Structure formats: C-alpha cells, structure tokens
C-alpha cells in the first residue's frame, strides 16, 4: 500500500481510498470421484500462488456418485442448496456472480484463463473493508468465535455477513479419499504435457491415493443468504459495525481434522444482488494459543510443492520436499510417512 502525504483537507479522503482492499472469493465445486477435478485443484493452486490473500478459495465437495466425508462436511457447512444449482464438476463461482466458470479454463475451452475473470473482479471497488479476529471459545478447542468489523465507505445497500470455517491438509488412507485422475494417461497431449500446472498429473496414477485436500469447508453460518440482523438495515458511510459469530470443528463427522490448519472466512453478502461484495480470510490460532487478527497477520501458507530436482508435485511425497510459501519464501521439509 502506498503512503501518501497530503494536506489536511484531503487526508481523510486519501486514507479511505487506500484502505479499500478488494478480495475475490472463489467457491470451487469438486469431488474425489470426479476425474477432471484435478484440473480444478491445479487451478486453485496456481491462482492462490498468483494472488495470495487477495483470492479466498473455498473448495466445496459434492457427492459425484457416493457421499464422502468432505461432501458431508460441505453440506453441513451450509453449501447444500448452492451445490444443487451446480451441474457438473469441476466448476466455480467468483463472488457468486451469475455465471458458473471452469476453475482453470475460466470462460475458455482450454488453457489457464481463470485469471482473466479474477482480475475483472479485483478491479471492482468494494463498498466496505473487513477486519476480523478468531479465537477459541472453549478449553477443548472445539468451538471458535469470530469477531468482525465492517467499515463502510458508502451509505445505503442491504448487506449481511456470512461465515465459513475451512480446513487444510485433510487426508485419509481409505478408498473414499482417493482422487480420481483422468489426466494420468495424457502425457502425449501437447496441451497438457506443456502446461506446467497440469503436466504433473500425467505422472500420477488413475487414483491418487495420498492426496492432501485444502480449503475444505467444515462449518458455516449463514452461508447461503447471510445472517439476518448481522448488519443494520440502514448503512451510513464512514460507520463501523461489529458482529460476532461462532463455528465449531466438526470432528463428529471427521475426527482427524487438524486444528492447526483452520481458517475463518467472513463474506459480505449484498442482498440486492445475491453476490459477495468483499470478504476476509484469517488463520484460526493453533489450539491453546491467543487469537489472530486480520489477514495481514496470518501465517504464510503452502502454495506449491517441489521435489529436490525441481519437479512440481501435486502433493508432498515421502522424503525431502521443497515448499513454496505464500510470502515468497521456500522451505525444505522431510516427510517420513
């Protein structure tokens, strides 16, 4: 963010303009039994690497043939009605715009073009900024509380807040977690083998058995239509509004959720358009620690995995791995199991 020094009459205006940070929400619709959905995984990985915290990803899992733990979590989080409107995976919506897009191709029929649609959304000026704090509510670290402050820069409008709790590094050894991969035998397709994001999947088997899933919704509040009364009916420019909501870690559905890899997302829903006008994502603090405030203070996340010889991996492998983080740094990590 640029620092601008302006005489007093314009100072408040300059601060307001600088403060308005637009973030795009990509709700990606996927499933482990969907063979083309690895393209969606490649798309959100590449997009997160490009945009960092300006892009908020929620990987919503549906029941392609049979229900899975992640599809059950997605429905319990509040995505059941939204999933019913999606006809075919992989797919995505950006800020809940009317059009459903491919999470890799965008509106095109091939190639990595979803960035064109993300850029278009990022160019919009949001009506408000959001800040948030996440903290544990109980000694067992099973429930969290999110406190949100919304600062509006324009009057009017009908807005509500919605909350989503997501988890990273979800995995299991049972067959319901195997990711079907239709790219496994496409290394002779030039469009695939020359694509750095898709080519790694040609080296995988038809069923990827050790896939680690990120951005999976595990709980939510008001996901579909927003929480009634979360914001006042009359919005005044220059005003700040506070709201609190609780969510819980759904270990009743999936016992092995890792609580150190949780994220709280707050959506600013425009009830007149049914779209998301802005949002914020923050890390939930590790269990038995203090709260974490706003996206700027969140810990860096893994955006890509590489082998020691520089090959990009679809997931960490046993042995030495090189991790690229969202803050631009890299780390070497040894995986023993």
Please give the residue ranges for each predicted region.
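Positively charged n-region of N-terminal signal peptides that target proteins for export
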Residues: 1-5, 337
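Hydrophobic h-region of N-terminal signal peptides that target proteins for export
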Residues: 10-18
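Local sequence-structure signature of Cys/Sec-based thiol-disulfide redox active-site neighborhoods
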Residues: 20-60
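Short, small/polar residue-rich loop motifs at catalytic or cofactor-binding pockets
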Residues: 23, 298-301, 317
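Terminal processing/anchoring signals of secreted or surface-associated proteins
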Residues: 34, 92, 289-296, 310, ...
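Short, conserved sequence motifs used for protein processing/export or organelle targeting and
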Residues: 56-288
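Residue-level detector of functionally pivotal "anchor" positions at catalytic/ligand-binding pockets or at interdomain
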Residues: 281-309
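C-terminal tail/sorting-segment detector
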Residues: 320-337
